[in-house]
């Protein structure tokens, strides 16, 4: 869904995305091997987190539409990661299910920022296809609470930005080595 929103984010200085790691079959195997009673107790190593993210990126790219808009979005996504404008981290110890979008305004703005929370994932389905429900919170206390909680989780998260780029460029249809004749 990035291709659908990036034009609206062009003037944004910095974008931080924090993702949770879903409980897939590989995760269940790790839980069984480690005798962890719940996912809440599970803590991925940095390597396991990056490997899981690699699979998620490959799956997202496989399911993406084969259009010029998606391809432009992927180029922009990689460009923003390489420039430092976009940073993606994965939280290794619990699946983050909450959908929270925090906007921080410039210093001279009327207020510090806003929070949007609700059911929309940052995917094509969540942004375009599904019927979703979201709420904008304008209260400064809500903004501060969300910002503090996000920063708390961010500091313990694993940077997976380069893993995104590496996976897209080496293990998906976006790779230069993938040709119609290969």
Model-identified regions with their sequence ranges:
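PLD/PLD-like phosphodiesterase catalytic module centered on the HKD motif
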Residues: 1-182
């Amino acid at each position: 869904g990035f291709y659908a929103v990036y034009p609206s984010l062009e003037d944004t200085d910095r974008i931080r995305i924090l993702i949770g790691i879903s409980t897939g079959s590989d995760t269940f195997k790790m839980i069984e091997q480690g005798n962890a009673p719940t996912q809440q107790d599970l803590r991925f190593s940095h390597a396991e987190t990056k490997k899981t993210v690699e699979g998620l990126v490959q799956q997202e790219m496989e399911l993406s539409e084969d259009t010029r808009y998606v391809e432009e979005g992927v180029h922009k996504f990689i460009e923003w990661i390489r420039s430092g404008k976009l940073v993606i981290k994965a939280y290794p110890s619990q699946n983050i299910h909450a959908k929270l979008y925090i906007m921080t305004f410039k210093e001279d703005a009327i207020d510090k920022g806003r929070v949007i929370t609700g059911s929309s994932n940052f995917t094509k389905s969540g942004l375009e296809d599904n019927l979703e429900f979201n709420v904008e919170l304008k209260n400064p206390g809500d903004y501060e609470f969300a910002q503090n909680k996000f920063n708390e989780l961010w500091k313990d998260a694993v940077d997976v930005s380069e893993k995104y780029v590496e996976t897209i460029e080496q293990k998906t249809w976006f790779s230069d080595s993938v040709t119609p004749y290969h």
